[in-house]
């Protein structure tokens, strides 16, 4: 069984070779306000800075480290039932919150039977947060399904928010190890499909130079080493 990473970090992983950047390396800066596609894999940056009304999606295949990233920068834990408010008033939405809430009523059913309900509740919470709050909304999503990217982008535009993505790019073996470490494993076939769609998405962004969805203001591609060196994600007026 793989060893667990130190709490709050994503240690010990080399930058992914799955989708090598074709752009010139980003200059080493302490603060970046993303406004386009930024490939920061293997880079060094202290702070990402977004508008206070941003919709920020933290994306990656299962086990990539999305929940750990949310905990590291926003103090969000996935073992609570309701969304947490992080620094700068950000509301943080993780699908595991819906799973914990529903488990009390549906514990007697095998999880695959009520997984669609979890995703429905999660997306209802995303819609409500984008509609009803004025501060930043941070969203946990794999981004490997086009319909989820389109839906979130549509809602963000509908409620006057800029959509930004942080994409955690890690090798499949590392993501699989992350699933074992957290104790939540994805079916092997489903995981393989996630990886295939992720690779296509990375090609779209890095080689075809297209955004993952129309209307996305920025895309930041990072690996675990980059995340570990970052100190904060800020939202400013």
Show which residues each predicted segment covers.
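NTP-dependent small-molecule kinase module
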Residues: 1-30, 42-46, 204-237
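Phosphate-binding P-loop
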Residues: 45-53, 129-132
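Residue-level preference for the first positions of well-ordered beta-strands
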Residues: 53-57, 135-138
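Conserved GTP-binding G-domain of TRAFAC-class P-loop NTPases and closely related GTPase folds
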Residues: 55-59, 64, 76-81, 87, ...
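Conserved substrate/cofactor phosphate-moiety recognition/catalytic segment
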Residues: 68, 73-133, 174-176
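Conserved nucleotide-binding/hydrolysis micro-motifs of P-loop NTPases
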Residues: 97-99, 143-144, 169-174, 226-227
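Glycine-rich phosphate-binding loop used to anchor ATP phosphates in small-molecule kinases
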Residues: 113-163
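Conserved phosphate-donor/acceptor-positioning beta-strand/loop module used by diverse small-molecule
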Residues: 159-178
